[in-house]
Amino acid sequence: QQRYLNAKRYVKLAIVADRSMVTKHNGKLKKLRKWIYRIVNTINEVYRSLNILVALVYLEIWSKEDLINVTSAAKDTLASFGNWRATDLLKRRSHDAAHLLTNIKFDGTTVGKAYVASMCQQDSSVGINQDHSKINLLVALTMAHELGHNLGMSHDVVNTEKQCNCGTCVMAPTISDQISKLFSNCSKNDYENFLTLYKPQCILNEPSKTDIVSPPVCGNELLEVGEECDCGSPETCQNPCCDAATCKLTSGSQCAKGLCCDQCKFSKSGTECRAAKDDCDIAESCTGQSADCPTDDLQRNGKPCQNNAGYCYNGKCPIMLNQCISFYGSNATVAPDICFNYNLKGEGNFYCRKEQATIFPCAQKDKKCGRLFCVLGPTGKRISCKNTYSEDDPNYGMVDLGTKCEDGKVCNSNRECVDVNTAY
């Protein structure tokens, strides 16, 4: 648990500057870009104390017209921006969170708004920020604050039982003249709780050099174009393989970090760098030519797993028993065959396939690839065939694809029970 919490995280940030920002900078896009790069550099600096690096991986400037309706109603603007991000921006560029920068004044004293505990979520990993000051640092701290909300942090409330011992930290409810780049103990707790509860996966992946669109800064701990390594400032760098002043490897070093970097040299070929997580995963080993561990690879589909209870499918071992347990709890088991006869009817929710409104009943041999049936506890003479479905998700409550339906057979994407050797 502690190792999970202490792992380095990378927020790959997309920033959108709207038309009002272009007007504010008199159409000088180069000047506007510089302003934004400075903001991101500050945000990265602020978050390094939490072992988070923030990298700008995309910058979009709406120089002709706004692609959403940006208004003084912060709540509405945030909702439209979240929607646009999910339906448009995410399809064009992969990123973890998107923030809007606008010169439009929001109602009341609001200078920013963001969804809380939403990092990595498709339509809510967003924030909106007003470019409210001539002082770059103040705007940067506003965006850092809104990003804090995405990462699960609530406001530091003074005089509560929580005792957030910091009046001017990043998550203070209002901006004050005393500028602080620090997070309170409450913010740190909120962030750790967010990691534990939501387990956001997207921020575990490091951006590649070419993903980062801002000019390289030696000493920001991000590996960028033109750098061989980046271990932070000369004062804080603890890495003997990297020269902090130049971001080049020290003499005789082959690498500065990586799962296959050992004491500044590439690990020997064949050294295991990622153990197999389970039956359907493969262990990876170093090549001897690189500091990176090869891409995480999976066992082939159809390989027996969990003592022949199932067959691997896309890195998982789908078996009906586990599906029943996930729906009904630990005393659930797979129902007897007689329950699966409902799938032969092709009525209501009992079928193998549904295309538009047409329902296709299961053939006798495929009945265990349709709706899943489970029983709870010991069964007496009367069997209660439990099943579940959802109006919103047609696959919910169906037997998972790749599940073993008979010895040597699995459910394919057409929900037919077919030979495992020819299924994939």
Swiss-Prot record:
Q: Which residues are glycosylated?
A: N69, N185, N331
Q: Per its record, what are the GO molecular function terms?
A: metal ion binding; metalloendopeptidase activity; toxin activity
| Position of sequence motif D/ECD-tripeptide | 279-281
> Where does it mainly reside?
secreted
Tell me which cofactor or cofactors this protein depends on. Zn(2+)
Q: In which tissues is it expressed?
A: Expressed by the venom gland.
Report which superkingdom the organism of origin falls in: Eukaryota
Q: What else is known?
A: Negative results: does not show hemorrhagic activity.
| Subunit structure, as described in the record | Monomer.
Q: Which family does it belong to?
A: Belongs to the venom metalloproteinase (M12B) family. P-III subfamily. P-IIIa sub-subfamily.
The name under which this protein is listed is: Zinc metalloproteinase-disintegrin-like brevilysin H2a
